[in-house]
């Protein structure tokens, strides 16, 4: 491309002492290109961030991802260009003209478009063959490892929650986790780094439709995973305000920080994981029917805080008790949430497992059966200690179990932080 430009310039007697204005597609980008002008659509965009130079002077940087018919590329907007008037109003799919940009390689060797003092961005209403966001949206059943800068569509499958962590540089971070399923019904884990609950509605139904704009596909410990960052745009069906929930308390566990972890069920036999950070349920006991106004409801994950309220109601026979929601072992299916009653066939075994990151974690497992079948019950970390109290021949009731596919296609049950084990004999 560059060699051809030199030939054309020579034919027309143009001096090459000045940079040559170049127009090209994103797939043809190369480090060193200058005076680059091209037409693309916006995929997503990060907030502007402030950094310091070596001399201590501040500068701003904003990152944008753009796409055309064939490829995607990262765009860096420096200093004043990071806060161009109206840039916050750019939306996914908007057609823009990038003017007089230059290209450098990023840390991974990929060409990155840079917009500095001599460059600009303009919104255009030209007719374009570049597809719209809707046209490039994929169902998550179509995903493959290694794909990047995707727009994907799926439905909430289970819990949506946020987490805090410490990154490799020792700095605190946050992430939003969820699980989505596509047209084939298969769930895929989603991790959105740099996101938290403030970026999504307070009320999200258990089967809500979700579109994520700007994600990458990686292979994790349990298959494909969808990864995003603070530039990823989240579109979720939901309401700003949570709605009241009426449920029967099935079991109450306590987290290490004292938070009450309550498993509840409503009249449709939908199980809820209720995290009480405000001690609002201190007056309640297992078996009670309660009405709560949560601060957030993400799928079946319910949060109670100081802005929530809880009240006890008269018993409602239409809301099932624990005995009526227990599942027989032969009816357990992968990714479901269950409560079971069984007899211990094999005492729990405890061992240390080393993860890919080198961390050693505790795993306990025991073998149980009911009158329909047998299954392994396992617990990691703190949940492993719950199993250690079980003994051979005991009849036990376990709540808050999650079913996963194990070795050789067999299904295994895993304790969660909402699990409780009660001995029946």
Where are these regions (language model features)?
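Single-stranded nucleic acid-binding proteins centered on OB/S1-type folds
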Residues: 1-425
